[in-house]
């Protein structure tokens, strides 16, 4: 019963991770944040693998899922430090989130709750084919929204890691022993028995 509860809980956690990752992917696409987009895609694939491993009780898939969650926690910790400008990290350095291919920032920078965007015409600071804007009146600055989003990812990943380790501990080591159809699919191959050779006897005919 406890094993079933653990599997069901892990499936729920994976579903929450998928919802959070897809929501984050949408906003990262709108903000042209290519590095987070790539990371989110890998995370979605890993979570799907985790769901598959949980439903079919495949310990190898659960271990891969747990290993990815460690990487995912590290990535989101970096995002938190990046937006809070911890240490030498700066939001104005090299545009890390866009692979230095554009000047776009987080979508929440201009579209946060209560934000008022005002364009600055003919600004000498504007690069070619770009314009300068000022953002004011935000109820919550965009960097804190990104930090909260990453913190949620870390929170779900920690729970997912614990339950993945728990479920994989009680998973069968031999993956071939798993029966998808609850016993109906098991098939033991038996080679056909050799048919005894017929004894040939001469046939005599009378003329």
UniProtKB/Swiss-Prot annotation:
Subcellular location field: Cell membrane
GO biological process, one term: regulation of sodium ion transport
CC annotations in GO: plasma membrane
Pfam families noted in UniProt: NKAIN
Sites where a glycan is attached: 100
Topology with respect to the bilayer: Multi-pass membrane protein
Protein name, entry field: Sodium/potassium-transporting ATPase subunit beta-1-interacting protein 1
Organism: Danio rerio
């Amino acid at each position: 019963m406890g094993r079933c509860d653990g599997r069901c809980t892990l499936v729920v956690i994976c579903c929450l991770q998928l919802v959070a990752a897809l929501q984050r992917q949408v906003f990262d696409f709108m903000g042209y944040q290519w590095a987070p987009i790539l990371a989110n895609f890998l995370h979605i694939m890993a979570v799907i693998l985790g769901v598959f491993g949980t439903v079919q009780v495949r310990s190898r898939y659960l271990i891969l899922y747990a290993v990815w969650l460690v990487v995912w926690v590290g990535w989101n910790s970096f995002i938190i430090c990046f937006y809070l400008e911890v240490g030498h990290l700066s939001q104005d350095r090299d545009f890390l989130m866009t692979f230095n291919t554009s000047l776009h920032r987080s979508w929440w920078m201009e579209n946060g709750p209560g934000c008022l965007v005002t364009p600055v015409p003919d600004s000498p600071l504007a690069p070619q084919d770009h314009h300068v804007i000022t953002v004011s009146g935000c109820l919550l600055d965009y960097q804190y929204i990104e930090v909260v989003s990453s913190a949620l990812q870390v929170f779900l990943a920690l729970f997912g890691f614990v339950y993945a380790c728990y479920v994989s501990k009680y998973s069968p080591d031999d993956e071939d022993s798993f029966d998808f159809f609850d016993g109906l699919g098991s098939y033991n191959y038996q080679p056909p028995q050799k048919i005894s050779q017929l004894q040939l006897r001469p046939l005599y005919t009378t003329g």
